[in-house]
């Protein structure tokens, strides 16, 4: 069941069309990637879901009903442009933002202390925000986004500015929050993160929805019938009947890694059967799916 449904959403800013009849179904308890080049309309859609901006037409449903301002309290939003008040102490800032989301002072303090301890930043409580580095401030803002245990989290470029260690920390937290039942909208240009984290995606370009669906389904849809065969043995692959062409075949001390282009769809089992008839040992045989980065470039270029 879709937790968030965007139905025929349109939004204009004067003569500029930001979203043109865009419909999305965001499943409950999954990570949904909202993708697109700069200026495609992603941020506008995020702001509409958050009720920061009102659409010209169309509607957003939250758990099957029109979204209300009360529902917004159940959303945790990490914008791409971070916005902590630089002159405030970190603890005061975090308390203020948590209480804006409906938490009592007691609950906010207790939950924030847990998160600060978890991230190893408990000694930052009395620091001014302006004393923090960009990465340190982003840790604090991530905590303020999730501290009220939102049922929906919207994370816009959450890994931007983090070093690899802290990016991995945030990645693990996102997956843990998903395991706890949260729904996550992840807006990012990092296609590796999309492949690793997202269950489903939608790609928007020039204010239109280009494609939506499961990540693996989309990768298979744009597949090119290539497979990787790792084997040991001296029988040349050319001895196998013509079910494929050989793109590459490297030999490392008798262990071969070959990339094969199959002659048609659904021939993988046939190829494996014929290869096994030769005097070789098959170590692995897998489909090579295109990367999301390549699919992104292809679709954005085609719809430019």
Predicted regions and their residues:
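ABC transporter nucleotide-binding domains
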Residues: 2-6, 11-205, 211
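A broad structural signal for alpha-helix termini and local helix breaks/kinks
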Residues: 13, 101-102, 119, 222, ...
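Residues that scaffold the ATP/ADP-binding catalytic core of kinase and kinase-like folds
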Residues: 70, 145, 218-221, 295, ...
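Residues at or immediately preceding the N-termini of alpha-helices
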Residues: 105, 215, 265-268
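ABC transporter nucleotide-binding domain
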Residues: 172-261
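Short, charged/small-residue-rich alpha-helical element at the C-terminal edge
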Residues: 226-299, 304
């Amino acid at each position: 069941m879709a937790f968030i449904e965007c139905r025929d959403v349109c939004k204009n800013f004067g003569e500029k069309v930001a979203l043109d009849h865009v419909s999305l179904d965001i499943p409950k308890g999954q990570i949904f990637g909202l993708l697109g080049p700069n200026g495609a309309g992603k941020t506008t859609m995020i702001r509409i879901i958050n009720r920061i901006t009102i659409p010209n037409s169309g509607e957003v449903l939250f758990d099957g009903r029109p979204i209300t301002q009360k529902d917004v309290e159940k959303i945790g939003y990490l914008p791409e442009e971070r916005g902590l008040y630089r002159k405030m102490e970190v603890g005061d800032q975090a308390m203020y933002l948590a209480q804006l989301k409906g938490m009592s002072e007691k609950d906010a303090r207790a939950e924030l202390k847990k998160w600060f301890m978890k991230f190893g930043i408990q000694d930052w409580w009395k620091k001014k925000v302006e004393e923090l580095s960009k990465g340190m401030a982003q840790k604090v803002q991530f905590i303020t986004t999730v501290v009220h245990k939102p049922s929906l989290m919207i994370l816009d470029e959450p890994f931007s500015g983090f070093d690899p260690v802290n990016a991995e920390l945030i990645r693990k937290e996102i997956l843990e929050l998903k395991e706890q039942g949260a729904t996550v909208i992840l807006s990012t240009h990092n296609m590796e993160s999309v492949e690793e984290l997202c269950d489903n995606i939608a790609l928007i370009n020039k204010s239109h929805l280009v494609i939506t669906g499961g990540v693996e389904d989309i990768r298979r849809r744009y597949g090119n019938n290539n497979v990787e065969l790792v084997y040991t043995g001296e029988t040349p692959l050319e001895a196998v009947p013509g079910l494929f062409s050989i793109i590459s075949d490297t030999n490392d001390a008798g262990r071969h890694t070959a990339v094969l282009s199959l002659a048609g769809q659904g021939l993988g089992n046939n190829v494996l059967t014929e290869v096994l008839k030769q005097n070789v040992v098959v170590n692995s045989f897998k489909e090579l799916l295109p990367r999301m980065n390549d699919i992104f470039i292809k679709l954005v270029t085609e719809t430019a």
